[in-house]
Amino acid sequence: MPTEATVAKFRPYTPDEIEAISEQLYSAYGDVQGRLLKTMARGDITSWRKAFTSQQLAQVERMLDDLNATTAFWTETHVPDLYKRGLWTADGYLQPGGLSKFAHPGEWTPMDLGMARMHDEAVRLLAENVALPLQEANSYCAQRIGDMVARAQKMAELAGKGRTIPAGLTELDYLRDTAEGQVQLRIRDASLRSMQQAFAQGMTRQEASRAFVGELQRRGVPCFIDRAGREWNMETYSSMVSRTVAHEAQRHGLQNRMVEIGEDLVEVIPHTRFKDSCDEYEGKLLSITGKSVGQTVGRRKVVASVDHARATSHLFGPNCTHSAVPYIVD
C-alpha cells in the first residue's frame, strides 16, 4: 500500500478545483449570452428591415459557432486530463509507489489491450457528453432567437393595424378568436408576452421593443428545455453540463482503473459546498460492480452499488460535487 504522502499526491480534484475548470467553459457562454443580448437590444426589433435582421442573425450565428469551437477546445484539453486524474488517484491508492502496472508486466496481453481501448472509448464518450448537448443547445438557441425576432415583428405588424387585446379578454381568448391571432397562438415565451402586454397597454413600438429585450435580459437567452418543461439559459445550462461531465470524467477514470486492477470498493468523500439529497451516502462504502453489496469489509458494510446510489438519490448526478476514492482494508 502506498504511503500517506503518495496518496496525497494522487488525490482527486476538489470541488473547487473542478469548479474552476468548469468555469473556463461556462464563463465563455455567459459572455456570449451578454453579447447576444446587446445585439438584440441594438435598434428597434419591431421595425428591423429584412436586410438588417439578416445581418443581426448572422452575428448571432458567428457567436454560436465560436462557442462550438470553444467547447471543442475545452473538451479536448480537460476531459482527458480529468480522466487521467481519476486513473492516477486509483494508482496512488492501489499501486506501490503510485505507479500504474498491467496484469502482465513487460508484455501486452489481449486483456491489457482491451483495457487500453476501454479507457480511450470512455474518454471519447465523455467528450461527446459535453460537445453534443452544447452543440444542440447552441443550435436551438440560434433557431429560438430567429423565431422570436420573426414573432416580435409579426406582433408589431398586428399592433400597427390596431389589433390590440380588448379589455376583458384573455390573451388566449384573443389569439383563438381572431384570424391574425392564430399566427401567434403558440407564443408562450415570457419575453414575447411582455411585448404583447406592452402593446395592449398602448405603448409605442419602441417601448414594446424595450420591454421585450428587458425581459429577455432578465431571463437569459434560452437554449434548452428539460423533461420537466423548464427552460435553461445559456450560462446555467453550460455550467451544469461542464461541471457534471468534469466530475464524471474523474470518477470514471478512477472506477475503470479499479476494474482493471480487480478492486471493487469506493468510499464517498464528504464535501462542504452545500447540503443535498445525496449527503446520505457521505462516508459510505459502495460497490462498483454491485457484487460486494451487503458484505462487511473491515467492520464496515457495503451499503449499495454505485448505480443504485445514483438511481435512488442525486449522488453523482447533475451538479453533484461528491467524489469517491478506493477503499483499502489495512
Predicted segments, located by residue:
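N-terminal leader/targeting and assembly helices and adjacent pre-domain segments
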Residues: 1-224, 328-330
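Electropositive, gly/pro-rich neighborhoods at or near active sites that engage anionic ligands
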Residues: 227
